[in-house]
Amino acid sequence: MAFVLSLRMALVLVSYCPGGSLGCYLSRRPTLDVRENLRLLDRMNRLSPHSCQQDRKDFGLPQEMVEGDQLQKDQALSVLYEMLQQRFNLFHTEHSCAAWNTTLLEQLRTGLHQQLEDLDTCRGPVMGEKDSELGKMDPIVTVKKYFQGIYDYLQEKGYSDCAWEIVRVEMMRALTSSTTLQKRLKKTGGDLNSP
């Protein structure tokens, strides 16, 4: 009898611990993390976006992925993870240190790192091209190309204050889009093909 109770308790704990269920990442906490990251990005604003109109650029955020209609659960989690990883890398460059208030930047990095750790416990293996529902394009490659375009833009603009402001606004947009995919995953229990 004690063994059966211990086994039941272990199963209950596994279902609530990281890696034990989809809910390990898609709980209320990540929504708070996203809000905090958006708040930090907003506070990092040093220039009026209107003063940088001439530097605006469409980076081609892959909407078909962040909307989630064409992704399976594992792919969606991998896309969320890759977008977080790339965002973390972007704000962890030497050039980003020169562009932002170091206290706010460090808080943002810490928040992104915590989200990466939380999501890493829940995602499955990275999906490859042959598993992709987006045709011949691997979703992870698409995310990497999107961020490479951002790095190229920053370099082309000499890491100017306006270039960083445009990228800051783009990261807020991308973070909001990622939240849409995350909410959809949570709502559908990971089945993105359900209504």
Swiss-Prot record:
<dbReference type="GO" id="GO:0005615">
    <property type="term" value="C:extracellular space"/>
</dbReference>
<keyword id="KW-1015">Disulfide bond</keyword>
<dbReference type="GO" id="GO:0051607">
    <property type="term" value="P:defense response to virus"/>
</dbReference>
<dbReference type="InterPro" id="IPR009079">
    <property type="entry name" value="4_helix_cytokine-like_core"/>
</dbReference>
<comment type="function">
    <text>Paracrine hormone primarily responsible for maternal recognition of pregnancy. Interacts with endometrial receptors, probably type I interferon receptors, and blocks estrogen receptor expression, preventing the estrogen-induced increase in oxytocin receptor expression in the endometrium. This results in the suppression of the pulsatile endometrial release of the luteolytic hormone prostaglandin F2-alpha, hindering the regression of the corpus luteum (luteolysis) and therefore a return to ovarian cyclicity.</text>
</comment>
<keyword id="KW-0202">Cytokine</keyword>
<keyword id="KW-0732">Signal</keyword>
<keyword id="KW-0325">Glycoprotein</keyword>
<protein>
    <recommendedName>
        <fullName>Interferon tau</fullName>
    </recommendedName>
</protein>
<feature type="signal peptide">
    <location>
        <begin position="1"/>
        <end position="23"/>
    </location>
</feature>
<dbReference type="Pfam" id="PF00143">
    <property type="entry name" value="Interferon"/>
</dbReference>
<keyword id="KW-0372">Hormone</keyword>
<dbReference type="GO" id="GO:0005125">
    <property type="term" value="F:cytokine activity"/>
</dbReference>
<feature type="glycosylation site" description="N-linked (GlcNAc...) asparagine">
    <location>
        <position position="101"/>
    </location>
</feature>
<keyword id="KW-0964">Secreted</keyword>
<comment type="similarity">
    <text>Belongs to the alpha/beta interferon family. IFN-alphaII subfamily.</text>
</comment>
<dbReference type="GO" id="GO:0007565">
    <property type="term" value="P:female pregnancy"/>
</dbReference>
<feature type="disulfide bond">
    <location>
        <begin position="24"/>
        <end position="122"/>
    </location>
</feature>
<dbReference type="GO" id="GO:0005126">
    <property type="term" value="F:cytokine receptor binding"/>
</dbReference>
<dbReference type="GO" id="GO:0005179">
    <property type="term" value="F:hormone activity"/>
</dbReference>
<keyword id="KW-0051">Antiviral defense</keyword>
<feature type="disulfide bond">
    <location>
        <begin position="52"/>
        <end position="162"/>
    </location>
</feature>
<dbReference type="InterPro" id="IPR000471">
    <property type="entry name" value="Interferon_alpha/beta/delta"/>
</dbReference>
<keyword id="KW-0635">Pregnancy</keyword>
